């Protein structure tokens, strides 16, 4: 079953589980377990009470929300009926993106500490085994944030070097840059008075860790003050100041991955064509009033009400909508029925025992972005498709 369908069913059942019979509650919990597995979670995540999402992930979430709202606004002139893309069911050779997944993986290594009077070091360890193998990693970046030292305007830049450790190293140990176990991945310069926030591409390294778990010995972050023109005392002082705020220096692995699924070719039926074929007077339907016709209705799903607010960061709920209403005979184009639905309605009108009536169902769906903690307290931003009903029709 598609993840979005499972999620919708689970949320509806969880909302009514408290007043339900024991068997119903058991079924609800089983459905919850299923959706958690589909999401790559072994159980309900239980992040620490003070756990927060990095600002960077919040920014990405808001960007996705803005893009979604912009797309919705551009469709504002369309009606809920008559904008369907018909699917002919033929498989296509291409694949389409099922979901975009962005994870912020926190490191479990040592502390940032002075290695000498002009540099600091930190060993970074990242658990990439938590990324499901069903996902294809598209990008992997080390995101570094070093706070600004406004008093450091009189010192040169910082050289930030990232090395891959090719053998096991004790945490909080000082590693010589001449050590043969080090492989330089990248070096960037940072103005300490302005601080630094940026990413370094380490996709090849992460892929090597993923293909061979025993090769994951982590990274070495080496931060060194460039030459202070003989003023070693000032350089040493700046390094001490930076060391004092080392807890504010952050290093996270940002992994972008995707899941793919087979797609189907679609034949577009444009709105203008549907309107030109529609009956001039929709009120002429004999068996249903306008208010009872198949249409979209509001349905707000609250994650707080189902007890998921501890691990879902955003949104706390969303408008899912649902389809309900009659599909009367004759079935007009404005009810967005397929050719099959029109034929089925005709046969049903002749002999209602031969075939059932067609049903009011979603004909166009859109996705939502969710920001949440996984079982390893990684922050995940994921786009789930087919979560919001955009249009309804008779099927």
Curated annotation (Swiss-Prot):
Disulfide bonds join 294-360, 323-392, 327-394. Its main location: secreted. GO terms for cellular component: extracellular space. Pfam families: TGF_beta, TGFb_propeptide. One of its GO terms (molecular function) is cytokine activity. Glycans are attached at residues 50, 116, 336. SUPFAM superfamilies: Cystine-knot cytokines (SSF57501). The keyword Disulfide bond applies. This is Univin. It comes from Strongylocentrotus purpuratus.
């Amino acid at each position: 079953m598609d993840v979005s369908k499972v999620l919708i069913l689970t949320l509806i059942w969880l909302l009514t589980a408290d007043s339900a019979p024991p068997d119903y509650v058991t079924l609800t919990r089983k459905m919850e377990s299923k959706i958690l597995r589909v999401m790559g979670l072994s159980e309900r995540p239980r992040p620490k009470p003070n756990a927060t999402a990095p600002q960077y992930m919040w920014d990405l979430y808001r960007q996705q929300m803005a893009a979604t709202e912009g797309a919705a606004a551009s469709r504002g002139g369309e009606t809920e009926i008559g904008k369907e893309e018909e699917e002919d069911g033929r498989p296509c050779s291409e694949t389409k993106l099922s979901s975009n997944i962005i994870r912020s993986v926190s490191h479990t290594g040592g502390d940032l500490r002075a290695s000498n009077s002009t540099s600091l070091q930190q060993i970074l360890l990242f658990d990439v085994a938590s990324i499901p193998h069903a996902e294809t990693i598209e990008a992997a970046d080390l995101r570094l944030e070093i706070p600004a030292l406004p008093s450091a305007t009189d010192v040169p830049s910082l050289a930030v070097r990232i090395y891959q450790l090719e053998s096991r190293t004790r945490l909080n140990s000082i590693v010589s840059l001449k050590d043969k176990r080090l492989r330089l991945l990248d070096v960037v310069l940072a103005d300490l008075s302005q601080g630094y926030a940026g990413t370094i591409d380490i996709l090849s390294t992460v892929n090597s860790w993923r293909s061979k778990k025993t090769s994951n010995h982590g990274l070495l972050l080496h931060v060194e003050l460039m030459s202070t023109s003989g003023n070693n005392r000032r350089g040493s002082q700046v390094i001490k100041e930076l060391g004092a705020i080392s807890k504010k220096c952050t290093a996270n692995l940002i992994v972008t991955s995707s899941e793919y699924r087979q797609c189907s070719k679609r034949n577009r039926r444009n709105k203008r064509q549907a309107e030109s074929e529609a009956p001039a007077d929709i009120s002429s339907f004999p068996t249903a009033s306008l208010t009872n016709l198949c249409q979209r209705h509001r349905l707000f799903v609250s994650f707080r009400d189902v007890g998921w607010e501890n691990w879902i960061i955003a949104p706390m709920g969303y408008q899912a909508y649902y389809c309900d209403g009659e599909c009367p005979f004759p079935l007009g184009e404005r009810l967005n029925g397929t050719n099959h639905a029109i034929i089925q309605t005709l046969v049903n009108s002749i002999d209602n025992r031969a075939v059932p009536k067609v049903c009011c169902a979603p004909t166009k769906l859109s996705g939502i972005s969710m920001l949440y903690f996984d079982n390893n307290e990684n922050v995940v931003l994921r786009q789930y498709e087919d979560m919001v009903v955009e249009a309804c029709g008779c099927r």
